[in-house]
Amino acid sequence: MAREFSLEKTRNIGIMAHVDAGKTTTTERILYYTGKIHKIGETHEGASQMDWMEQEQERGITITSAATTAQWNNHRVNIIDTPGHVDFTIEVQRSLRVLDGAVTVLDSQSGVEPQTETVWRQATEYGVPRIVFANKMDKIGADFLYSVSTLHDRLQANAHPIQLPIGSEDDFRGIIDLIKMKAEIYTNDLGTDILEEDIPAEYLDQAQEYREKLVEAVAETDEELMMKYLEGEEITNEELKAGIRKATINVEFFPVLCGSAFKNKGVQLMLDAVIDYLPSPLDIPAIKGINPDTDEEETRPASDEEPFAALAFKIMTDPFVGRLTFFRVYSGVLQSGSYVLNTSKGKRERIGRILQMHANSRQEIDTVYSGDIAAAVGLKDTTTGDSLTDEKAKIILESINVPEPVIQLMVEPKSKADQDKMGIALQKLAEEDPTFRVETNVETGETVISGMGELHLDVLVDRMRREFKVEANVGAPQVSYRETFRASTQARGFFKRQSGGKGQFGDVWIEFTPNEEGKGFEFENAIVGGVVPREFIPAVEKGLVESMANGVLAGYPMVDVKAKLYDGSYHDVDSSETAFKIAASLALKEAAKSAQPAILEPMMLVTITVPEENLGDVMGHVTARRGRVDGMEAHGNSQIVRAYVPLAEMFGYATVLRSASQGRGTFMMVFDHYEDVPKSVQEEIIKKNKGED
């Protein structure tokens, strides 16, 4: 089957936003107008096409990123609808990794909200061009220009309107196009009858002012346009559009549009903007990767002629076809039934069938081309972030950064029958979601699951019950602490056992130093002259890694430590890998005496919105919870407080805030960083853990 749409006519976009800004409804409308669905499903009625899991329909939030394909103006648009709830950050992150552009949806009453900041920051990290859609213009309190100002104030984004609303709230009836300088007036409820008219007289001055601002902002990103602008020459609409496209693709400019997805206004114009301003796979730099045979960096330009290279970005268990692997093709062509190499794992995989997904319905296809997003059936060893390539042209593409889980729960099966099923269920769920970890406590035999927040674990336990029919008792949530060293030290690990027959002998000197936050564990071999033979070096590293899984103070995993093996000795007969593993773990224990070990706790960025009269209460809440206020701003009659607070102090805060503000206060929290716990708290944690052991 030949390629249906050329690469220039392909767009891979994500729809991202804060929870409840109307992302899924916006996606629904896109599918309606592009002819993918014939009846619109409302999220708040639990009938949305994209929210296809039972829990999503019950909770009215999007949990997994459903991928779908639509067509608009002779272009193919692959859309990924991502969740806005902070506990599902990995879904957003893995979508951004494989997208070329994104639509950020704002609630035009609230503007930029906490999770908008998180997804915006992630999109900036991945260099994803964005357009902004200020949604819910029909809502009471909708304020388009306020929303635009929050993009400047909270995100420091060079964002400018390319549209203005005509009316707002119940009176929202049309949109001014600042490029054509025309008004689009909606005359029916489905948003399909649109009249293009001259701009109403009462809006003309404002439209001219914002058109001028737009031209100036775009000219600042392009020298040729700047010269024309300064010399007073007219910049044509075509030049303006080309300038916006170039600056948007270079992530220097963010066009802002407005509308109401629920009231069917502005979505088609937003689709036009996706085509006009967001990049095709040809507009973005070629993907880079490492050739595993040479360790050299290589690129794969977006072209069907190049060797096949793709990134698996999501694993999903489908009740009808089994394990689905979603992947983005960066270069080359892939046919069903062919073999590929998973270069991340060094395993050969057979592509059974290839499916084009539409939320949770599917269409089987024979071939995928560069720039496509599809799902494959039949891959056994592939997990999130793995590279799939042509066997003759290996490359490992940059993987997906997986955030560390911050919260854990103990789960135990209710019956013997549940016990066997629980292991399989947890393994399948962990395959789908890399931020979900499953561990068994060696000493107690308990199963501990960790994730990004209470809702995250709640949904997974719920899925275990519904999809895998496993009943389990769940313990209270616990904080995932970490341990580290705060000082440098040198330590010896010496292990010798001789009791008849072959003995054991391992001797190492290791220098331990604190590493930068987030860098994890780094091992350096500085042995000179073979005092520790080469074949035992990996055993030393392995011994350290295994020991660091249970830290020296309270048994929490150790992070951000550098270890340099610089000296040691061995025995010709008695030295073995086991002996050197044990020696390394003894060196770590010895180092703990002088390396100032510390316990780290997850700090959350908490954003609390309360009526003005409750501001004093909230400041008291933050202080009482060992938090520190980072900033405050007024919004209407409310105050928004941003603060850093330890996760350990936030359990049950929803109830406290509700009673203090008579149910009018809300809060959101996002994991921000790890920080040393105060000495008094550290002693309590150690005591508690010793008591439990």
Curated annotation (Swiss-Prot):
Keywords of the record: Cytoplasm, Elongation factor, GTP-binding, Nucleotide-binding, Protein biosynthesis
Source organism, top-level taxon: Bacteria
Transmembrane segments: none
UniProt keyword Ribosomal protein present: no
InterPro entries: EF-G-like_DII, EFG_II, EFG_III, EFG_III/V, EFG_IV, EFG_V, EFG_V-like, G_TR_CS
Domain tr-type G: 8-282
GO cellular component terms, semicolon-separated: cytoplasm
Endpoints of the signal sequence: none
Similarity section: Belongs to the TRAFAC class translation factor GTPase superfamily. Classic translation factor GTPase family. EF-G/EF-2 subfamily.
PANTHER family: RIBOSOME-RELEASING FACTOR 2, MITOCHONDRIAL, TRANSLATION ELONGATION FACTOR G-RELATED
Subcellular location: Cytoplasm
Annotated CDD domains: EF-G, EFG_III, EFG_mtEFG1_IV, EFG_mtEFG_C, EFG_mtEFG_II
Stored Pfam families: EF-G_D2, EFG_C, EFG_III, EFG_IV, GTP_EFTU
Name of this protein: Elongation factor G
Record's keyword annotation contains Protein biosynthesis: yes
Gene name of this polypeptide: fusA
NCBIfam families, alphabetized: EF-G, PRK12740.1-3, PRK12740.1-5, small_GTP
SMART domains (UniProt xref): EFG_C (SM00838), EFG_IV (SM00889)
Residues that bind GTP: 17-24, 81-85, 135-138
Function of the protein: Catalyzes the GTP-dependent ribosomal translocation step during translation elongation. During this step, the ribosome changes from the pre-translocational (PRE) to the post-translocational (POST) state as the newly formed A-site-bound peptidyl-tRNA and P-site-bound deacylated tRNA move to the P and E sites, respectively. Catalyzes the coordinated movement of the two tRNA molecules, the mRNA and conformational changes in the ribosome.
